């Protein structure tokens, strides 16, 4: 007896006869509703820029965290469910600190990304199978290690890719095509900031201000821009 489409829909570990995992596909669709995030790798470091959706004037803009530090040499931008992103980031922070404690050296960016994707593939850390579901979040992981600057992109299936530039979220299609036109490997960090913010400006539905965008760079240490620094980048547009 074959299961119906809805029964395949419910299981996160049951393939349909066409070889599809519907819950993972739906999680990937959920990211297309999230805020836009852009990452660009340059020879000096990596720049991340994210749209912050401040849905109410009563909301404190600084409490909307869309870029987080994982270790002093790694940061990540996210699109999708923020609670899911926090779970992955907390896991990555523990992994990087354990590595530093055990081996006396920072964890490489690829190993950190691998640790995040291993958890994404297990759909959580608990043994409570009935509660597990794919993480509805995609991450842009920026870092600087002995191999130089690097940018990785992860999705809910637990897959990751290394990129030179990447956009995720609701405006990702338009942003990706703009990145293809404007990106080159000789960009400076300052040019990368300007490109990332100008592309965000195109895809966002409102005026760009320090309250609704976040920018960070890893070169070689992670640094989240202050509102004044964001204002300075906006002034260059």
Curated annotation (Swiss-Prot):
A Pfam short name: Proteasome_A_N
Spans traversing the lipid bilayer: none
Described purpose of this protein according to its UniProt entry: The proteasome is a multicatalytic proteinase complex which is characterized by its ability to cleave peptides with Arg, Phe, Tyr, Leu, and Glu adjacent to the leaving group at neutral or slightly basic pH. The proteasome has an ATP-dependent proteolytic activity.
Protein name: Proteasome subunit alpha type-5
SMART domains: Proteasome_A_N
GO biological process, one term: proteasome-mediated ubiquitin-dependent protein catabolic process
Statement: the UniProt record of this protein carries the keyword Nucleus: yes
Subcellular location: Cytoplasm; Nucleus
Recorded GO CC terms: cytoplasm; nucleus; proteasome core complex, alpha-subunit complex
Source organism per UniProt: Oryza sativa subsp. japonica
UniProt keyword list: Cytoplasm, Nucleus, Proteasome
Similarity comment: family membership: Belongs to the peptidase T1A family.
Gene: PAE1
Main localization of the protein described in the UniProt heading: cytoplasm
